[in-house]
Amino acid sequence: MSDQNPSSFVRTRIRRFSEIDNAYGEHYQFRSRVPFKSFDDRIQESRLIFSGTISPIGGYSRRHHNHEATTVYRSLCLRGFVVQGSLDPRNRGLEDVFRVIDDIGWSYTVLHVNPFCPRVVREFISNIPFYEDGALIRGFFYRFSPSVINQLMMKPTVEHSFQWKDVVLNQAITHLTGGQCAGWTGFNLNALLDPFQILYCVCERSWLPGPDSDLMMRKRLRLMYAVTKCKQIDFGQLVYEQVIDMTRVRDLETSLIFPNLIYQLLVLQKEAPLLPGDEDPIGKGIPIYDSGSDGSGPRGRRRLC
């Protein structure tokens, strides 16, 4: 790549993202930290790897570990979902954002964000507290751990995860706003530089989803700073901790997070059996647009997309 001029470099990057799910994959030469594969290819490879780890536990009709799990499931039916965000790799306006995400190997957190079966996701959440490193899903034990998340999301191995929660907030804000703001006082999300406004939308839906409290906003800014500085972060641990914390929340007003990712992790291991009464899949990834697009949505203190 060293002999490429800048214009050809841009064309190469745009092409490699636009060809992820097309037929040209074997022809492009760009070396990425993460090999780009179609979702079908990912399914075939991962199911082959996990074929010997999915243990049967009863029949398809066994949806809950015990009565307590059944009770939890019923309460989960009263709660909605935070559908994750997706980026269109063909959108040239997202070039800078894709580069940042690809540099840390998190490309698949914004790609292949497919619809999910609500009942299966709720069953997973209700059952996971009763098993170590996995959950019962309709008569089978599916694995769920930080290492499994990283493996299935094709996240590069991280030996020592950067402690992003310790990032100095003022330093993060100064960097992400290009010096327009020096700290939390007077800070507004619209002060973020354009690529970082898009990155914030990714963060609030796909990395640190949840209520838009000041505490959560600060956490997102710290994580974004670490990401833009190409710090190595254990994505699997990041997601795992949030999912486990979610299983302890009983507030019916709190939406369930990571539904697309949870369902994807299950499907990548083994097709979840469908049962009578299952709804059609819902919640295809919400498109996140570049800042110049008409679809970028309302802007304000707390919402960017």
Regions found by a protein language model. Name each.
Residues 2-300:
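A structural signal for long, well-ordered, hydrophobic/aromatic- and basic-residue-enriched core segments
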